[in-house]
């Protein structure tokens, strides 16, 4: 990660860390690095945003920066992040930009770029933009007079994206009753339209954005109300998206959460059965549940683990030409259809499996036994030394012997804080908590910041 770019673009508190001034520079310098210096005099750039109140302010500044470098900007309005990624590629744009802080609270916002291929930027491209941001007054082109171009609104882009999504399934959803939670974000109008167009009977919550209520006690990070609504309305299942629509979490007919691991398993199992799963492989992160890997093994499906973060999942998928991957948190990437995590796409693919198999979501998800998980964070002096600490290794080995293959241990440094994360999965909740505490106590004793 650089000075400005994190694992998912540039983020910060809107108008404090992510200011209009910074948004202007990101538009100008990002537009130059990713579009203008390819030799295009007026490169086409698509700009979308979520429902945050700060979105319009940052959008105006960003577009001004892009136009100042000579870009022809098409404003998509409120749309999901994967919608921007798809349209950038489909419409032959040089660059796509999304203004969103995903599942973060309303005070935050972010700016992320997509190249002409629809993929997020490489580290090298981000470093090039950062180098310009740190210069006093970089000498870049400034078109004048007739060389300054208008920007245009292309709000029809959302409909084009939804039509594409609809074309990826071969069935309609007549007879399915589905509750949709739009997190008061980008999918608030997109999801009901898409599922309604596919003839599902839909109920909605979290689909009334007012600029301030995005992700507030709703969406994929807060599926409790969705679970209540599914049971109350006797629906077949529910789907919760996050603020920018790149994540999804499901709820079965009994109000039980079905997470990203289970969704990947259900879709992967169907793809494998139909010989559509490239190299019989699903890419996940080290945080996926042990039950996920055991269920895949029983189906004859291979798995490949990456570091935590959907960008690492996508990198591995591209490297190995794999077409399904994702995270427990609900970022699911289906590379046959889009270049990034796509909640709406995943949702209709999941609904398609439910419709075609005639099985309930609880029945499909129940094929994967989730192991109870316990996570303890320990504040430490040097998080990176945990992997070489002899005492920590010793207690981990001891616990592994005691678990006898019915569990998993993951001890890793946090990517953003001075913490070591101790995660243990075991046969019972009690075992998971006991083993995690056992390891965390040693980490605290030998490396703890607060000891």
From Swiss-Prot:
Q: Which organism is it from?
A: Staphylococcus aureus (strain JH9)
Q: Any idea which positions bind Mg(2+)? A: 102, 242, 244, 246
Q: So which residues are the signal peptide here?
A: none
* Pfam families on file: PGM_PMM_I (PF02878), PGM_PMM_II (PF02879), PGM_PMM_III (PF02880), PGM_PMM_IV (PF00408)
Cofactor names from the entry are:
Mg(2+)
The top EC class, named as a word, is: isomerase
Q: Which gene encodes it?
A: glmM
Q: What is its EC number?
A: 5.4.2.10
Q: Which GO terms describe its biological process?
A: carbohydrate metabolic process; peptidoglycan biosynthetic process; UDP-N-acetylglucosamine biosynthetic process
Q: What is this protein called?
A: Phosphoglucosamine mutase
Q: What does this protein do?
A: Catalyzes the conversion of glucosamine-6-phosphate to glucosamine-1-phosphate.
In this UniProt entry, the residues modified to Phosphoserine are 102
């Amino acid at each position: 990660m650089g000075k400005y770019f994190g694992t998912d673009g540039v983020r910060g508190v809107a108008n404090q860390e992510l200011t209009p001034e910074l948004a202007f520079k990101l538009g100008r310098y990002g537009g130059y690095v990713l579009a203008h210096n390819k030799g295009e005099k007026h490169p086409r750039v698509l700009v979308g945003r979520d429902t945050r109140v700060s979105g319009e302010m940052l959008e105006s500044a960003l577009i001004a920066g892009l136009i100042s470098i000579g870009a022809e900007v098409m404003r998509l309005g409120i749309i999901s992040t994967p919608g921007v990624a798809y349209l950038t590629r489909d419409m032959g744009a040089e660059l796509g930009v999304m203004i969103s802080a995903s599942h973060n609270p309303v005070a935050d916002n972010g700016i992320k770029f997509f190249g002409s291929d629809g993929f997020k930027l490489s580290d090298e491209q981000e470093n090039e933009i950062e180098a310009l941001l740190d210069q006093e007054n970089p000498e870049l082109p400034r078109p004048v007079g007739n060389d300054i171009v208008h920007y245009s609104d292309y709000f029809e882009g959302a409909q084009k994206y939804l039509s594409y999504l609809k074309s990826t399934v071969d069935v309609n959803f007549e007879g399915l009753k589905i509750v949709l939670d739009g997190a008061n974000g980008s999918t608030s109008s997109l999801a009901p339209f898409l599922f309604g167009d596919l003839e599902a009977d839909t109920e909605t919550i979290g689909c009334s954005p007012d600029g301030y209520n995005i992700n507030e006690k709703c969406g994929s990070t807060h599926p409790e109300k969705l679970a209540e609504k599914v049971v109350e309305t006797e629906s077949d299942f529910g789907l919760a998206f996050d603020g920018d629509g790149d994540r999804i979490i499901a709820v079965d007919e009994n109000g039980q959460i079905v997470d990203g691991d289970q969704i990947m398993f259900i879709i992967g199992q169907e793809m494998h059965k139909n010989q559509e799963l490239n190299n019989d492989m699903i890419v996940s992160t080290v945080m996926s549940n042990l039950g996920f890997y055991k269920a895949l093994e029983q189906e004859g499906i291979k798995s490949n683990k990456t570091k935590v973060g959907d960008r690492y999942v996508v990198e591995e998928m591209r490297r190995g030409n794999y077409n399904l991957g994702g995270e427990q948190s609900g970022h699911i990437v289906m590379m046959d259809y889009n270049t990034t995590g796509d909640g709406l796409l995943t949702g209709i693919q999941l609904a398609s499996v439910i419709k075609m198999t005639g099985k309930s979501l609880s029945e499909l998800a129940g094929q994967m036994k989730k192991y109870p998980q316990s996570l303890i964070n320990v504040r430490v002096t040097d998080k990176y030394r945990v992997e070489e600490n002899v005492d920590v290794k010793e207690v981990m080995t001891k616990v592994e012997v005691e678990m006898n293959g019915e569990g998993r241990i993951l001890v890793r440094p946090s990517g953003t804080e001075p913490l070591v994360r101790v995660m243990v999965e075991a046969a019972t909740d009690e075992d998971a908590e006991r083993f995690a505490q056992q390891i965390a106590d040693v980490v605290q004793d030998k490396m703890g910041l607060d000891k």
